[in-house]
UniProtKB/Swiss-Prot annotation:
Organism (species): Synechocystis sp. (strain ATCC 27184 / PCC 6803 / Kazusa)
Disruption phenotype: Deficiency in glucose utilization and/or glucose intolerance in the absence of light; no longer grows if less than 6/24 hours of light is furnished during mixotrophic (MT) growth on glucose, no heterotrophic growth (in complete darkness). Accumulates glycogen under MT growth, but seems unable to utilize it. No expression of phytochrome or its response regulator (cph1 and rcp1).
Gene3D superfamilies named among the record's database cross-references: 1.10.287.130, Glutaredoxin, Histidine kinase-like ATPase, C-terminal domain
A GO molecular function held by the record: phosphorelay sensor kinase activity
Alphabetical GO biological process terms: circadian regulation of translation; circadian rhythm
Known role: Member of the two-component regulatory system SasA/RpaA involved in genome-wide circadian gene expression. One of several clock output pathways. Participates in the Kai clock protein complex, the main circadian regulator in cyanobacteria, via its interaction with KaiC. KaiC enhances the autophosphorylation activity of SasA, which then transfers its phosphate group to RpaA to activate it. In addition to its output function, recruits fold-shifted KaiB (KaiB(fs)) to KaiC to cooperatively form the KaiB(6):KaiC(6) complex (independent of SasA kinase activity).
Record protein name field: Adaptive-response sensory kinase SasA
Induction text: Expressed at the same levels in light and dark (at protein level).
NCBIfam families: PRK09303.1 (NF006800)
Keywords from the UniProt entry: ATP-binding, Biological rhythms, Kinase, Nucleotide-binding, Phosphoprotein, Transferase, Two-component regulatory system
Record keyword DNA-binding present: no
Subunit structure: Homooligomerizes. Interacts with KaiC1. Interacts with KaiC1 and RpaA. Binds to the B-loop in the CI domain of KaiC; SasA and KaiB compete to bind to the CI domain.
Modification Phosphohistidine, positions: H164
InterPro entries linked: HATPase_C_sf, His_kinase_dom, HisK_dim/P_dom, HisK_dim/P_sf, KaiB_domain, Kinase_SasA, Sensor_HK_Regulatory, Sig_transdc_His_kin-like_C
Phylogenetic lineage: Bacteria, Bacillati, Cyanobacteriota, Cyanophyceae, Synechococcales
Length: 383
């Protein structure tokens, strides 16, 4: 008998076996017991037993469609046969008489001088396993290539979108500065102080908008490189909103809330990470439910805001948020005064902002005290 722990070159012995084992400590005991049983049963018959760990040969496990360990495969003489489970020794004892008959009907090729037709089975199986492994690796490489091409296309789209977003405030600021320059060259009596102040205010406002856009870009880059692994895909945001709403039906019913769904059917797909955006929608819905009184209403809507962006909005008729706090609620651990005894918005909205920024989108709130709140976020349209 010959035995090895790796799939090697085929021998021309009349009996060939593969024994698949797992990594459990008692696997070696099974190997010894099965090997000893084969030696006893096959006394006088040369045979080859190769021992393979399933963790090292997953493609062969798939090739032979194995579902249990240990598994003993008789490759030769044909037909191939699989014995599996904890009672392999009993199965060997049962099948050995039949195998003796098969050996008698299939004389040893070495004795007849004929070229062996099946002893190369082990080598061919190993070759098939390698082909399957290479095929899987090629598939993964093609998938990675498609994802990279999508990411490159997405980056190009984002650059165009950012250029468009920056152009508007830049144009407005330039007009204000040009007008100020014209006023500067007029006689003092023709210079209008009120207009001058208004133009200065307008220019500062537009510069602040540009500064905020640039800060969002830098933050998005930071989030992509550290906290988040964004796996962008074409995403039907309407379907995702509907799925999340269905999961919250019990909570809506518990407070007798009226839910309005206002998302058009022709809304274009966005390019986003489905699971991350699901977290954002779920978090905003959690907050809306928490702060909406019993028998209140919540509206989930979306619109194609521009050719490059889709805006999603979640509106409640809760107590609202003071104007002075509408920016700070997106900071980690922030609590409104009304939330000191509750969980509040906390890290939830901070996480939402980071997720949306990582998608090169924006998130904000429109609210007035005692008039409810509308949380909005934008995502880039998939092209």
């Amino acid at each position: 008998m010959s035995s090895s722990s790796e799939l090697g070159n085929a021998s021309s012995v009349p009996l060939q076996f593969l024994l698949f084992i797992d990594d459990r400590p008692n696997s070696q005991d099974s190997v010894q017991e099965i090997g000893q049983c084969l030696t006893n049963l096959l006394d006088g018959h040369s045979h080859d037993l190769q021992i393979l760990q399933i963790s090292k040969h997953p493609h062969l496990v798939e090739h032979f469609r194995l579902v249990a360990t240990p598994s003993l495969i008789k490759l030769q003489p044909e037909p191939r046969q699989v014995l599996a489970g904890s009672n392999i020794i009993q199965q060997l004892q049962k099948w050995w008489p039949r195998w003796q008959q098969e050996l008698a009907m299939d004389p040893n090729p070495e004795d007849t001088g004929q070229s062996p037709s099946c002893p190369r089975e082990i080598s061919s199986v190993g070759y098939s396993g390698e082909l399957m492994k290479m095929s899987d690796e090629l598939f993964l490489l093609k998938k990675d290539k498609e994802e990279l091409l999508q990411q490159i296309q997405f980056k190009d789209q984002i650059l165009a979108m950012l250029a468009h977003d920056l152009r508007s405030p830049l144009t407005a600021a330039s007009i204000a500065v040009d007008t100020l320059e014209l006023l500067q060259h007029k006689p003092i009596e023709e210079q209008k102080p009120a207009l001058r102040s208004q133009l200065l205010y307008q220019a500062r406002k537009q510069f602040k908008i540009m500064d905020r856009l640039i800060e969002d870009i830098l933050q998005a880059s930071k989030n992509l490189n550290s906290q988040f692994q964004v796996h962008g895909r074409p995403l039907a945001i309407a379907d995702l909103c509907q799925e999340v709403l269905e999961l919250y039906q019990a909570k809506f019913s518990k407070k007798n809330l009226t839910i309005t769904y206002d998302i058009p059917k022709d809304l274009p797909n966005v390019f986003a990470d489905e699971e991350l955006i699901r977290q954002v929608i779920a978090n905003l819905l959690d907050n809306a439910i928490k702060y909406t009184p019993a028998h209140g209403s919540i509206t989930v809507g979306a619109l194609h805001r521009t050719t490059q962006k889709v805006q999603v909005s979640i509106t409640d008729n809760g107590p609202g948020i003071p104007n002075s706090k509408q920016e700070t609620i997106f900071e980690g651990h922030f609590r409104l005064q009304r939330d000191e005894q509750t969980d509040g918005y906390g890290l939830g909205l901070s996480l939402c902002r980071k997720i949306i920024q990582a998608h090169y989108g924006q998130i904000w709130v429109d609210s007035r005290p005692k008039q409810g709140s509308s949380f909005h976020f934008t995502l880039p349209v998939y092209r």
